[in-house]
């Protein structure tokens, strides 16, 4: 993909690298997954490279199906394939974005264990605060394996919000 044009509709290769970590950890051939998604493996060596959002989406879907985890192994509890579809079905008829976000956050709290989000609204500004699970013995926060977990969570919520508002 041309890296000199506009960035609109593209994803940094850094996110591709992050998505591939779970494949490397499980010994799955990442090259085959990249090719299946229409992403040249050679782009991994180009730090400024970008891929189309549709190709990244194909990679995301392929990895989720292969691992049976739509959260890429980023939580101690996998988010089984089909969970996201069920989430969308549960949100499609909500009448406000606030209700949809609250329902989505409850859903994620059911399927993920390591952290959760809480919607806070103050002076017309909405914010999602992420809270890590605490260890039951020490009381200390149990942090996700990688910061990519937080980003993935927020990207999914943002994407859902855009989809719902666009309907």
Please place each PLM-identified region on the residue numbering.
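N-terminal low-complexity or simple alpha-helical regulatory segments
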Residues: 1-133
